């Protein structure tokens, strides 16, 4: 399930800052904000029937011209943070190693991910989530 940016990032930061080893298992769906929170874990497991979805989030802006302009700048920043998180996770993905070599440059990965997200919501299977680097492995049992 998705969620609000600020709430999700509070959870993301708490996981990243934890001194404990954190494993997250995605069940059913990891979409929007939950796909970002998922990236905070030290170990990211996804069940076989879970789907993964990422996209540029939606926003509403209203009010005075300058306020809307400032909000747009903040939204751009949010998108950059999101892309940095995904890039950091995916740079080690098998897909990007096959496409760009064993040590793909993060800028190439980020460019690819940006292009995919600009085409709309990006839905992928559990297998593809592992292939791209959004998840570490499929959890068949534990």
Where are these regions (language model features)?
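Charged, glycine-interspersed solvent-exposed loop segments at helix/strand-loop junctions
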Residues: 61-142
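Glycine-rich beta-to-alpha active-site loop
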Residues: 2-11, 15-61
């Amino acid at each position: 399930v998705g969620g609000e940016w600020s709430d999700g990032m509070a959870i993301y930061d708490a996981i990243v800052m934890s001194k404990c080893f954190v494993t997250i298992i995605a069940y059913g769906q990891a979409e929007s904000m939950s796909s970002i929170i998922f990236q905070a874990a030290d170990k990211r497991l996804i069940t076989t029937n879970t789907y993964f979805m990422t996209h540029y989030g939606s926003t509403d802006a209203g009010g005075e011209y300058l306020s809307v302009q400032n909000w747009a700048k903040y939204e751009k920043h949010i998108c950059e943070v999101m892309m940095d998180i995904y890039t950091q996770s995916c740079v080690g993905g098998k897909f990007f190693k096959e496409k760009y070599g064993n040590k793909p440059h993060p800028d190439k990965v980020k460019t690819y991910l940006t292009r995919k997200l600009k085409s709309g919501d990006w839905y992928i299977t559990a297998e593809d989530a592992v292939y791209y680097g959004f998840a570490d492995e499929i959890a068949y049992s534990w």
